[in-house]
C-alpha cells in the first residue's frame, strides 16, 4: 500500500511541475515568442473558455468508449502537449498559430486534473489507503518550488528553459 501512496504522491508532484511550466510562465514564454500583453490575455481567456466547454467531455471519454482508459486519455493529452510545446519551441510560427497552440496547452493540461482524482478513488476502491491531502499538498509544494526555481533559471538562461523543464517533468510523470 505504501508503494501506491508513493506512486500517487509522485504523480501529483510531477503533474503540478508540468502545470507550472504551462500556467505559471505563460506571460514570460509568450512574450519571448513575440506576443503582446493583450494577445497573452486573449490566450489565457480562450484557454479558460475552452476548458469550461471541453473538459467535461474529455474527462468522460473513458465512460463513452469501453477500451479507452483514463491512463490512455492522459497519454493522448500528453502527446498533444508534447507536440504543441515542441512546435512552439523549435519552429518560428505566426502569432495566431502560437496563440492556438498555447490555448491547447492551457486547456488540455487542466483536463488531466479529474483523472488524477479518479486515480485516487480507484486506489481506494481497490482497498488502498490513499492520503489524497498529502499527495495534493506535495503537488502544491512542487508547483511553488518549481515556480521559484524556474524564475531563477529563466533569469540565468532564457525563457526557453521552460520547455526543457516541461519535457523533463512530463516524461517523469508519464513513466
Spans of features found by a protein language model:
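Symmetry-related core transmembrane helices of the 12-TM Major Facilitator Superfamily/SLC fold
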Residues: 161-175
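Structural signature of the two symmetry-related core transmembrane helices
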Residues: 71-87, 167
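Helix-to-loop junctions at the C-terminal end of transmembrane segments
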Residues: 53-69, 154-155
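Glycine-rich segments within core transmembrane alpha-helices of 12-TM secondary carriers
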Residues: 50-52, 130-150
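Small-residue (Gly/Pro/Ala) motifs that create kinks and tight helix-helix packing interfaces
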Residues: 27, 58, 145-154
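Helix-loop boundary and gating motifs at the non-cytosolic
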Residues: 1-52
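Hydrophobic core of transmembrane alpha-helices in multi-pass small-molecule transporters
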Residues: 13, 84-85, 95-115, 119
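Paired intracellular helix-loop junctions of major facilitator superfamily
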Residues: 120-131
